[in-house]
Swiss-Prot record:
Family designation: Belongs to the ferredoxin--NADP reductase type 2 family.
Pfam families assigned: Pyr_redox_2
Cofactor requirement: FAD
Species per Swiss-Prot/TrEMBL record: Streptococcus pneumoniae (strain Hungary19A-6)
Origin: domain of life: Bacteria
Protein known as: Ferredoxin--NADP reductase
Catalytic activity field: 2 reduced [2Fe-2S]-[ferredoxin] + NADP(+) + H(+) = 2 oxidized [2Fe-2S]-[ferredoxin] + NADPH
Keywords for the protein's UniProt record, in alphabetical order: FAD, Flavoprotein, NADP, Oxidoreductase
HAMAP family membership: FENR2
The keyword Flavoprotein is assigned to this record: yes
Signal peptide (UniProt feature, chain positions): none
GO MF, one example: flavin adenine dinucleotide binding
Length: 322
């Protein structure tokens, strides 16, 4: 028979990891279920060397460092972690929830969903022959291996701008965006404009020039024009964002707003006892940042504790007094 947990956290990214740690501070029996093969979510898998700018008090913190610190924080507690396990159904029983996964079943008194944007994969570059080129990349695992190489980046959001600024320190860097304006933090855009990065706007990639295995040049075409330019490069990085899939979320009987779980001020969903935090939840004024999700975690945990035992105060002691 499955053990009965106080709190089951669905998602092992930064927000889920911190929620598990905080749940232990409330002496809850907690476990984590994640469909990915490793903890840490997108920062660990896609951005291990990218600086995370919205965690207060930790300048120059990378995705890998953030993940390692959160795991280290959790290591002092007994936390069953189920990786490569996808949640299929969450069913309300008399006094608990039955969670059916791709590998089995779990019983829990409450659920905190911290699955971010769900399963994710990069939005691909759609040009003829793109699949065969080995020097077209969608994420960076070791930035130093590109030192001194000619790097071109496609995209206009935070990731594209941040990576351009990071690569500029070690390599000749070109950034190509189809619009004149960038969709990134104002401070980052200003830093980009003051940097040595070669900025090509408004241009879009139009042709790959190489031998089918190694890309040597990229042809770009000015938007609403026939004007073309050719960029010599050693590596091409595509930062067009990600396609996310919430998978079975729509089958869990929760009220949604555009594939996000609607929550109240307790971080509670339309089903009492099920909470949502981080990028997977929605409320008026919601901002999708790691810092926001980290703040939502204690709210969900404390209200879950109160749901389990109404005599437990929602407002706990401060950690400094524990």
């Amino acid at each position: 028979m499955s053990q009965l947990y106080d709190i089951t956290i669905v998602g092992g990214g930064p927000v889920g990891l911190f929620a598990a740690f905080y749940a232990h501070l409330r002496q809850a029996k907690v476990q984590i279920i994640d469909s990915l093969p490793q903890l840490g979510g997108q920062p660990a898998i896609l951005y291990p060397e990218k600086e995370i700018l919205d965690v207060p008090g930790f300048p120059n913190l990378t995705g890998e460092e953030l993940t390692n610190r959160l795991i280290e924080q959790l290591n002092g507690f007994d936390t069953p972690i189920h990786l490569n396990e996808t949640v299929l159904e969450i069913d309300k029983q008399e006094e608990e929830f039955a969670i059916t996964t791709s590998k089995g079943s779990h019983l829990t008194k409450t659920v905190i969903i911290a699955m971010g944007g769900g399963a994710f994969k990069p939005r691909p570059l759609e040009l003829e022959g793109v699949e065969g080129y080995e020097n077209i990349h969608y994420h960076v695992s070791n930035i130093q291996q590109y030192a001194g190489k000619k790097v071109t980046i496609l995209g206009g959001g935070d990731s594209a701008v941040d990576w351009a600024l990071a690569f500029e320190k070690i390599a000749p860097t070109t950034l190509v965006h189809r619009r004149d304006n960038f969709r990134a933090l104002e401070h980052s855009v200003q830093a980009l404009q003051e940097s040595s990065v070669t900025i090509k706007t408004p241009f879009a990639p139009s042709q790959l020039l190489g031998n089918g295995k190694t890309l040597a040049k990229l042809e770009i075409t000015k938007v609403k024009s026939d004007e073309t330019e050719t960029i010599d490069l050693d590596h091409l990085f595509v930062n067009y964002g990600f396609k996310s899939s919430v998978g079975n979320l729509k089958n869990w009987g929760l009220d949604l707003n555009r594939h996000k779980i609607i929550v109240n001020s307790k971080q509670e969903s339309s089903q009492a006892g099920i909470y949502a935090i981080g990028d997977c939840c929605y409320y008026d004024g919601k901002i999708d940042l790691i810092a926001t999700g980290l703040g939502e975690a204690p709210t969900a945990v404390n209200n879950a504790i109160n749901y389990i035992d109404p005599e437990q105060k929602v407002q706990p002691k401060h950690s400094t007094s524990l």
